[in-house]
Amino acid sequence: LVPFLGKTLGGLLARF
């Protein structure tokens, strides 16, 4: 799993 995916997931979670 690339860090980009993790960053995106984290951003989505933080947004919601």
Curated annotation (Swiss-Prot):
This is Temporin-1Tq. Antimicrobial peptide. Expressed by the skin glands. Keywords: Amidation, Amphibian defense peptide, Antibiotic, Antimicrobial, Immunity, Innate immunity, Secreted. Belongs to the frog skin active peptide (FSAP) family. Temporin subfamily. GO terms for cellular component: extracellular region. GO terms for biological process: defense response to bacterium; innate immune response. Its main location: secreted. The modification Phenylalanine amide is found at residue 16. It is found in: Secreted.
